[in-house]
C-alpha cells in the first residue's frame, strides 16, 4: 500500500526547538540558535571587548549629538546678546551727546546770568553814529519800497561813497596839506623823521565822526570795496607782467633757433669751400709729377748703357754685332713702365710684359735661344 511520506515542513533541523517561546526574537533564524534553544549561537563568536567598544562608541555618539545641540543653543543666545549690546551702545552714545548739549546750555545760561549781574561798560556795545538826514531814513523804512528798490538805493549809495573816497585819496596824494609843506621846507632834527614818514604814508580819509566813535557799516563797506579794488589792480598788473615775461621767453627761444640755423648754414658753406679748394689743388698737382717722372727716366736712360734683352750685350759688343735681333733695349723697357699716379698712389699698377710674350712678339723663342748659345 502506497503511503505518502511525511512532509519536511513538519520536521526541523533542530528537533528540540520550541517556536512558541517568548524569549526568542521574532523572525530569528533557527541556525543562529544553539541546540538548547538559547538563541545566542553567533554572539558567542564575538568577544566581549568588541561589544564593550561598540557600546562606548554608541554612547559617545549620543553625547556628541547632545553637546552639538547645546552649542547651537548657546550660539543663538550669544547672537541675541550681541544685538542687544549694539542697541544699548547706540542708546548710550545718544544719551551722552544729549547730556553734553544740556551741560553746554546750562553753562551758557549761567554765564549770561553772571554777565547781566556784572557792571555794564561801553565796550560791550557797538556804537553807531546817528543819521543826520531823516529823508534817507524815511526812504529806507518806507514799507512801500520793494526789495529791488532798496537794493538799488543801497548800490547807488555805495557807488557815491566809493567815488568820494577815491577822489579824497587822489587829492590827498596829489597835494599834501600846507602844514606838511612848511615842515618839509624847514626840517629840524626832531621833526625830520616825522615829516619823511608823513610824506611817504598816505593820509587817512577825513571822516565826520570823532576819534572815540566807532566806524559805521557804510564806512566799513567803503573800506572793503577800496581794498578789493586795490587787490584787483595788483592782480591785473601781475598778469601783465607775466604775459610780458612769457612773450620775452618765446621771443628768446625763436631767436636762438634762428641763430642755430644760420650757424649751421655757415658751417656747411665753409665745408663746401674747403672741399672745392682741396679739389683744385689735387687737379693741379699731377702735371708736375708727370713732368718730373719722364725727366728722371731720361736721366737714367742717358746715364745707363743700352743692353740687349736677348743676348744681354751692348750694341758695341762684338758678339752682339754678329746677331740680327729685334732689339728691345732697357731704355725702351723703362719707357714702357707705367708711371705711379700722384692722386691715388695705392692703385694696382698694370703688370710688366713677360719675357715669353716679348720673345713671341719678336720671333720664335727657340730660334733665338739657339742663336744666342
Curated annotation (Swiss-Prot):
Q: Where is the composition biased (Basic and acidic residues)?
A: 134-151
Q: Which family does it belong to?
A: Belongs to the SPC42 family.
Function field: Forms a polymeric layer at the periphery of the spindle pole body (SPB) central plaque which has an essential function during SPB duplication and may facilitate attachment of the SPB to the nuclear membrane.
For this entry, the protein name equals Spindle pole body component SPC42
A single GO CC term for this protein reads: cytoplasm
Its subcellular locations are: Nucleus; Cytoplasm, Cytoskeleton, Microtubule organizing center, Spindle pole body
- Residue ranges, compositional bias (Low complexity): 187-210
The record, for Pfam families, names:
Spc42p
- The organism is Zygosaccharomyces rouxii (strain ATCC 2623 / CBS 732 / NBRC 1130 / NCYC 568 / NRRL Y-229)
- Show the segment(s) annotated as Disordered: 104-151, 169-216, 278-299
**Which keywords fit this entry according to its UniProt record?**
Coiled coil, Cytoplasm, Cytoskeleton, Nucleus
Amino acid at each position: 500500500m502506497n503511503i505518502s511520506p511525511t512532509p519536511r515542513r513538519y520536521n526541523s533541523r533542530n528537533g528540540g526547538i520550541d517556536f512558541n517561546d517568548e524569549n526568542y526574537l521574532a523572525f530569528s533564524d533557527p541556525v543562529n540558535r544553539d541546540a538548547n534553544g538559547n538563541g545566542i549561537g553567533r554572539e558567542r563568536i564575538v568577544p566581549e571587548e568588541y561589544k564593550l567598544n561598540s557600546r562606548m562608541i554608541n554612547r559617545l555618539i549620543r553625547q556628541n549629538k547632545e553637546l552639538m545641540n547645546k552649542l547651537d543653543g548657546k550660539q543663538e543666545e550669544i547672537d541675541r546678546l550681541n544685538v542687544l549690546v549694539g542697541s544699548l551702545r547706540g542708546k548710550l552714545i545718544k544719551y551722552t551727546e544729549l547730556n553734553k548739549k544740556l551741560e553746554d546750555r546750562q553753562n551758557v545760561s549761567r554765564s549770561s546770568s553772571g554777565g547781566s549781574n556784572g557792571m555794564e561798560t561801553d565796550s560791550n556795545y557797538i556804537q553807531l553814529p546817528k543819521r543826520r538826514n531823516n529823508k534817507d531814513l524815511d526812504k529806507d523804512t518806507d514799507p512801500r519800497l520793494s526789495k529791488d528798490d532798496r537794493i538799488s538805493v543801497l548800490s547807488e549809495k555805495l557807488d557815491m561813497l566809493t567815488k568820494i573816497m577815491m577822489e579824497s585819496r587822489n587829492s590827498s596824494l596829489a597835494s599834501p596839506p600846507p602844514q606838511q609843506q612848511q615842515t618839509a621846507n624847514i626840517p629840524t632834527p626832531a621833526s625830520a623823521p616825522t615829516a619823511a614818514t608823513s610824506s611817504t604814508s598816505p593820509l587817512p580819509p577825513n571822516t565826520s565822526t570823532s576819534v572815540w566813535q566807532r566806524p559805521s557799516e557804510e564806512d566799513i563797506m567803503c573800506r572793503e570795496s577800496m581794498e578789493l579794488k586795490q587787490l584787483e589792480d595788483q592782480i591785473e598788473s601781475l598778469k601783465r607782467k607775466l604775459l610780458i615775461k612769457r612773450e620775452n621767453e618765446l621771443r628768446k627761444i625763436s631767436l636762438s633757433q634762428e641763430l642755430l640755423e644760420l650757424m649751421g648754414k655757415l658751417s656747411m658753406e665753409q665745408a663746401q669751400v674747403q672741399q672745392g679748394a682741396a679739389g683744385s689743388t689735387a687737379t693741379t698737382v699731377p702735371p708736375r709729377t708727370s713732368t718730373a717722372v719722364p725727366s728722371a727716366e731720361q736721366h737714367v736712360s742717358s746715364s745707363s748703357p743700352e743692353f740687349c734683352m736677348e743676348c744681354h750685350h751692348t750694341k758695341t759688343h762684338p758678339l752682339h754685332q754678329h746677331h740680327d735681333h729685334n732689339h728691345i733695349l732697357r731704355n725702351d723697357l723703362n719707357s714702357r713702365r707705367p708711371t705711379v699716379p700722384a692722386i691715388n698712389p695705392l692703385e694696382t699698377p698694370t703688370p710688366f710684359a713677360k719675357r715669353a710674350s716679348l720673345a713671341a712678339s719678336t720671333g720664335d723663342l727657340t730660334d733665338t735661344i739657339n742663336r744666342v748659345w
